[in-house]
From Swiss-Prot:
The gene is pan-1. GO terms for molecular function: DEAD/H-box RNA helicase binding. PANTHER family: IG(IMMUNOGLOBULIN) AND LRR(LEUCINE RICH REPEAT) DOMAINS, TIR DOMAIN-CONTAINING PROTEIN. Keywords: Cell membrane, Cytoplasm, Developmental protein, Leucine-rich repeat, Membrane, Repeat, Signal, Transmembrane, Transmembrane helix. The chain crosses the membrane at residues 514-534. This is P-granule-associated novel protein 1.
Length: 594
């Protein structure tokens, strides 16, 4: 009862004080006239302005002793602040009265060497602080009662400390906190009940913490948790039931650990599952079931060698899944019906594997394209595999972006891309000598956004009008994003159709000739005009000789200065441009080494 009365009295006192309007000038008058290590005032004030997300004044105190900072903050007398930042000060133990006169929505105490927190250190911030940042300090342990009184806090940032141990109940009073950042610490074990009381927590970040063990019940009570980031740790053998209570979980990131087996069941709201850069060697080791909201699944940078017909059966109910990544594995075998359980895929990433063809062979040697069931696929990444042939029935007709670069492709069948509205096509760094006429007929050169066919051993017959690819690339203009040599495809007019009257080079020479003639005529006319003006000038000067007296040197100097023909030697004669000839459709000529 006494503590409640004290809180009410303190609140009333602050309200009474805040009625008196202050400015940064008024606030800084109360600060001590001393300077920090950079010869600047210990604390300065700034107004956040009308466009800031944080209303009120900002106080910044940098590179000074905590005693000096404390003396300056004492003068605030409860003035309402938007943000208080204390940075690069020296403090090992946080004084309990440091924030006694502070009333701020955001409080940051960063890079101060802080190692010890005392109970109730932040109690005076309870009625105002919504964000508390203690990142980049040296805190080693979080004890129970440290955060007592922070009843309005929504974000707690403890990243980049040296935290090794968290007492059970350390966060139990942070009932309104929605985001907790603990990344880049040294928390090897998460104990049962570590996050008790955080019923409104929505995002928990624990990446890069050397985490090895998560005890059962560590996440109990986190009924509102939506994002759990556990990447870049040393997790190996996980009891997957530790996540079972997280029914509102939308994102689970377990990337860059040592996980070899996965078992995720009954997460009705899970949208993104990240398991990249682990030690999974088989899709059979990934058991997924009842994930109806799953949209993105990332399994890249593992050791998966094959995908069987039933390996992804658990995703049958995940009819919202759009993106699947298996890049940078050791994939060489994909069964004919491997993707039949994920027919709604839009993006499939298979680059940097050992795939040799896009079809599988049954025991009876019947060839079956394994991408045939993906009728909605828009983006397919197959870069850096061992593909040698692309057949006419192997690619989904829905494709818009196709990457086949850095393979050993020597043949693409004439109808392989038929019916596709390709926007981005990458065929560079293969072994293509030619493409059948009509290969690109389904998409016009004007409609593509990017195409690259460079670094192939192209063979061209430039005097043959049937040599279509050079003309197609020329028509694509800026969409041709070739990063390497195009070989004979870059020869000007290669494959040019007969009947063209003026080649681009001839047209340029023709146009340049007319410009030269026009410039010569204008030069001669100008010289004639200058001669006539000079003659008139001397004729006029002859009638001035009978005048008495002589011009002074200054008169002669003035005469020369005012002479309209006194043109500097480096003057530029501007020749009017000749009218443009009607040359028909615009032609683009590309000059490249070949």
């Amino acid at each position: 009862m006494r503590s409640l009365l004290s809180f009410v009295l303190l609140a009333l006192a602050r309200i009474a004080i805040s009625e008196e309007t202050k400015s940064c000038i008024d606030i800084e008058k109360g600060f001590k006239e001393e300077f920090n290590a950079h010869k600047q005032p210990v604390c300065i004030c700034a107004d956040n302005g009308i466009f800031s997300t944080v209303k009120g004044f900002t106080i910044e105190c940098e590179s000074a002793s905590i005693a000096s900072v404390s003396e300056n903050l004492a003068s605030l007398n409860g003035t309402e602040l938007g943000r208080l930042t204390i940075r690069d000060s020296t403090v090992n133990v946080l004084p309990q009265d440091l924030f006694e006169n502070v009333f701020a929505k955001q409080v940051k105490l960063e890079r101060c060497g802080l190692s010890t927190l005392q109970p109730n250190s932040f109690q005076s911030l309870g009625g105002s602080a919504e964000l508390l940042s203690l990142r980049e300090n040296r805190i080693k342990k979080l004890e129970k009662g440290l955060f007592t009184g922070l009843k309005s806090l929504k974000t707690l940032d403890l990243a980049m400390n040296k935290i090794q141990e968290i007492d059970v109940g350390a966060f139990e009073e942070l009932k309104k906190v929605e985001e907790l950042l603990l990344n880049e610490n040294d928390i090897r074990v998460l104990k049962t009940g570590t996050f008790d009381g955080m019923k409104n927590l929505k995002k928990l970040t624990l990446q890069n913490c050397n985490l090895e063990i998560i005890q059962k019940g560590a996440f109990r009570g986190l009924n509102s948790l939506e994002q759990l980031i556990l990447s870049n740790n040393n997790l190996e053998n996980i009891d997957w039931t530790i996540f079972s209570a997280l029914k509102n979980l939308r994102v689970l990131d377990l990337g860059s650990n040592k996980i070899s087996n996965v078992e995720m069941k009954s997460f009705p709201k899970l949208e993104k599952l990240v398991l990249n850069n682990n030690t999974i060697d088989s899709m059979k080791s990934i058991k997924l079931k009842d994930l109806p909201s799953l949209v993105v699944a990332l399994f890249d940078r593992n050791k998966i060698e094959s995908i069987g017909d039933m390996d992804m059966f658990g995703l049958t109910r995940s009819d919202r899944i759009e993106t699947l990544s298996l890049a940078r594995n050791n994939l060489s075998q994909i069964s004919p019906k491997a993707f039949q359980h994920t027919p709604n895929l839009i993006t499939l990433l298979l680059q940097y594997n050992q795939i040799e063809e896009l079809s599988s062979h049954s025991p009876s040697q019947v060839r079956t394209p394994f991408l045939a069931s993906l009728k909605k696929l828009v983006t397919l990444q197959l870069s850096s595999n061992n593909l040698s042939v692309i057949r006419s029935d192997e690619l989904p007709k829905s494709l818009s972006s196709l990457a086949l670069d850095h393979n050993v492709i020597s043949k693409i069948e004439a109808r392989a891309l038929e019916g596709m509205e390709i926007k981005r096509l990458y065929l560079h760094s293969n072994k293509l000598n030619y493409l059948y006429q009509g290969t690109f007929d389904s998409f016009s050169p004007k409609s593509v956004e990017a195409v690259d066919v460079s670094l192939n051993p192209w063979v061209c017959v430039c005097n043959d009008p049937k040599e279509w690819l050079p003309r197609w690339l020329e028509a694509s203009e800026e969409a041709d994003v070739a990063e390497g040599a195009l070989g004979c495809l870059a020869i000007p007019n290669c494959g040019q159709k007969e009947g063209s009257t003026v080649m681009p080079e001839e047209e340029e020479v023709y146009r340049s000739g007319w410009i030269t003639v026009a410039a010569t005529i204008l030069t001669i006319v100008t010289i004639v005009i200058m001669v006539i003006i000079a003659m008139l000038y001397f004729k006029d000067a002859r009638y001035q000789f009978p005048l008495r007296g002589r011009r002074s040197d200054s008169d002669l100097h003035k005469l020369i200065e005012n002479d309209p023909l006194n043109i500097a030697s480096d003057s530029i004669l501007v020749v009017p441009a000749m009218p443009k000839r009607n040359t028909g459709p615009k032609k683009t000529v590309r000059f490249q080494n070949f």
